[in-house]
Design a protein with these regions (language model features):
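Acidic, small/polar-enriched beta strand-loop surface segments
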Residues: 1-4, 178-316
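Glycine-centered loop/turn motifs
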Residues: 49-57, 143, 188, 288
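Amphipathic, non-transmembrane alpha-helical segments in extracytoplasmic/periplasmic proteins
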Residues: 30, 39, 82, 97-125, ...
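Surface-exposed cap/loop segments at beta↔alpha junctions
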Residues: 44-125
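Oligomerization/assembly interface segments of phage tail-like spikes and tubes
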Residues: 28-44, 77-87, 208, 268-279, ...
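Polar/acidic, low-complexity leader/linker segments enriched in S/T/G and N/D
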Residues: 1-20
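Short beta-strand-centered interaction patches in the first periplasmic/extracellular domains
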Residues: 72-79, 84-89, 127-203, 207
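Short beta-strand and beta-hairpin "edge-sheet" elements
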Residues: 56-82, 292-323
Length: 326
């Protein structure tokens, strides 16, 4: 892949070959640092072809690219950076139409839905695929940033946002996420894992106290079974019965008390974690794809979505690191 430097009108200036390091972050987060890039070059290289605010750096046929906004000169090094294409989406806010509480998408083909959310807010640089995604989506949005809105809308239908710069435009489209949980990334797959499970602060029995006083007070008892099921059926007492009290006198109904007790019991579940080193695996994961891991020693299994990709290009070559579930 070539890293291209272009003017504000996408007229190519140069194919970058002389630079110290390029690093770009693409993630599901919506803060600036979740989707930005930085290029480091020697001052002599920058002086030959200045990279200034409003210029673009990108790779054709990939998501990697964005707008130059920051230029910093430190010593003999010039650092240029800015938001990626994905980061530029996070800067736009979806406002409801006049007189309406929400911007509503109702049973619409996914790419048409993205187009309806984007509108003309991003100008001619961005386009939405006109292909039929085969997916129908819905959603309601009120003063939500565009990236978050598209992500949340697609995620509930097992889809993700794909972003590709085709050489002239940044093309957005909805595609199905890939679930790799059937291909567990265990040690047999040469995926280094670290796992842990903590029961010390976990509880499986809640006694929730609602309205009333003493014998008239509403009481709800719930138990969490080993498989995670929440039940009102009394379970055997003993050393494994770990109880706590939820004091909720402001619950307006028995249903609200039960709902709050259920939430607290879920929050008090054993904490299981498994770290998957995806960097050594020869799979081109996409944001939103789901990976599954199994620690063959402890037997612990878990699945997580890919939430971040970090591209780094330097003298040692090109490498993409992944993060899952964070």
């Amino acid at each position: 892949m070539e890293l291209i430097h272009a003017k504000a009108n996408i007229e190519e200036i140069q194919s970058l070959t002389e630079f110290d390091q390029y690093e770009a972050v693409s993630g599901l987060g919506f803060k600036y640092a979740d989707n930005d890039f930085e290029l480091q070059v020697e001052e002599a290289v920058w002086e030959k072809y200045p990279m200034i605010k409003g210029h673009y750096l990108y790779e054709v046929g990939t998501e990697w690219g964005g707008m130059v906004e920051d230029v910093n000169h430190v010593g003999t090094t010039v650092k240029v950076g800015g938001p990626t294409w994905r980061g530029m989406l996070a800067r736009k806010i979806i406002s409801p139409p006049a007189g309406q509480a929400y911007k509503a998408i109702t049973a619409m083909e996914a790419n048409q839905a993205i187009a309806a959310l984007v509108g003309t807010s991003l100008g001619p640089l961005f386009a939405v695929s006109t292909a039929d995604s085969g997916m129908t989506v819905s959603g309601s949005f009120r003063y939500t940033n565009l990236l978050a809105a598209i992500h949340s809308m697609l995620q509930q239908y097992g889809a993700r946002l794909e972003i590709i710069f085709d050489g002239t435009q940044v093309v957005l489209s909805a595609v199905s996420s890939v679930d790799y949980t059937d291909t567990e990334l265990s040690q047999e797959y040469e995926a280094p894992l670290e796992s842990s499970v903590a029961y010390g602060e976990a509880y499986n029995h809640v006694i929730a106290l609602g309205r009333g006083e003493l014998t008239e007070r509403e009481v709800v008892e719930l138990w969490r079974l080993d498989d995670g099921t929440i039940t009102t059926t009394t379970q055997p007492a003993g050393a494994n019965d770990k109880q706590f009290v939820l004091d909720y006198p402001n619950a307006e109904s028995l249903e609200e008390l039960t709902s709050s007790a259920t939430d607290k019991l879920i929050e008090s579940s054993p904490v299981e974690s498994i770290g998957i080193n995806l960097d050594e695996i020869e799979i081109d994961f996409k944001l939103g794809d789901v990976v599954g891991g199994r620690d063959k020693v402890t037997g612990l299994t878990i699945s997580k979505p890919i939430t971040q990709k970090i591209l780094k290009i330097d003298k040692n070559g090109r490498k993409i690191n992944y993060k899952a579930g964070e």
